Regions:
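Beta-strand-rich N-terminal accessory domains
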Residues: 138, 143, 167-207
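Extended substrate-binding grooves/exosites of carbohydrate-active enzymes
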Residues: 2-77, 82-88, 93-102
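Buried hydrophobic-core signal for structured, non-transmembrane domains
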Residues: 75-82, 122, 137-141, 194
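Intrinsically disordered, low-complexity Pro/Gly/Ser/Thr-rich segments with frequent PxxP/GP/PP motifs
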Residues: 90-92, 97-141, 149-151
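Short amphipathic beta-strand/extended segments with alternating polar/hydrophobic composition
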Residues: 106-109, 151-152, 160, 193, ...
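Surface-exposed coil/turn segments at beta-strand junctions on protein surfaces, enriched
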Residues: 69-71, 85, 113-117, 130-132, ...
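Short beta-strand elements
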Residues: 146-174
């Protein structure tokens, strides 16, 4: 949909320390003429430098959608949101990452009619999870030929999914002497050849 505001409506000024900032409205004085409804809440700076929100808007408006059908098996649904363009016109890249490092990857061209969907399987079989490692699948859709205002190889859509793959947690094995517990009246005693703790079950004190 239409975005308001597109651009921050400010003028470049310097503060008392000489630092530059984009000024608007009351920045020019309490009684300075101002419409009162213009401010810096756009998607780009007054000099057209993009804000981080630009990436979010691009994602929301992209014409290719991705859904996880069975992420553990690498099965995803790709939807062509175009109304008149077949998705085979574009290249779909996929990468499997382990802690940000690509361990598998490839690219395909899928024949998906406008407003249609198709399932695609990323080869994650045989992936052995390592302790402390997160696994993700990244998708990127790029142009294969120049279009008006868009060069070849430009990314028109992207997405990322975490794979529900985790290594079994290693069982902690203590390397100290074995502990033994005994109870004597109101006292619980935990001891080994190196330590001796006495817990008073009434007061909670430890000696």
């Amino acid at each position: 949909g239409y975005i308001w505001d597109w651009v921050d409506q400010g003028l470049l000024q310097k503060d008392k320390n000489g630092r530059e900032y984009w000024a608007y409205g009351g920045d020019f004085g309490v009684d300075a003429p101002s419409d009162g409804n213009f401010l810096c809440n756009g998607l780009v700076n007054p000099d057209r430098g993009p804000h981080p929100a630009m990436a979010e808007v691009k994602y929301v408006h992209q014409n290719v959608g991705f859904e996880a059908v069975d992420a553990a098996a690498g099965i995803f649904k790709i939807t062509n949101r175009f109304y008149f363009t077949n998705l085979k016109k574009y290249q779909i890249h996929y990468n499997v990452l382990a802690n940000g490092k690509t361990i598998k990857g490839g690219k395909v061209s899928l024949d998906i009619a406008p407003q249609a969907s198709k399932e695609f399987t990323v080869p994650v079989n045989g992936l052995k999870a390592q302790p402390g490692v997160e696994y993700f699948v990244n998708f990127s859709v790029t142009t294969t030929e120049p279009e008006p205002l868009i060069p070849t190889g430009y990314e028109i859509a992207y997405d990322q999914f975490q794979l529900p793959i985790q290594a079994e947690k290693a069982i902690y094995k203590a390397n100290g002497p074995a502990l033994k517990t005994t109870t004597q009246g109101d006292e619980l005693i935990v001891s080994s050849s190196k330590v001796n703790f006495v817990f008073n079950k009434n007061s909670g004190l430890v000696t």
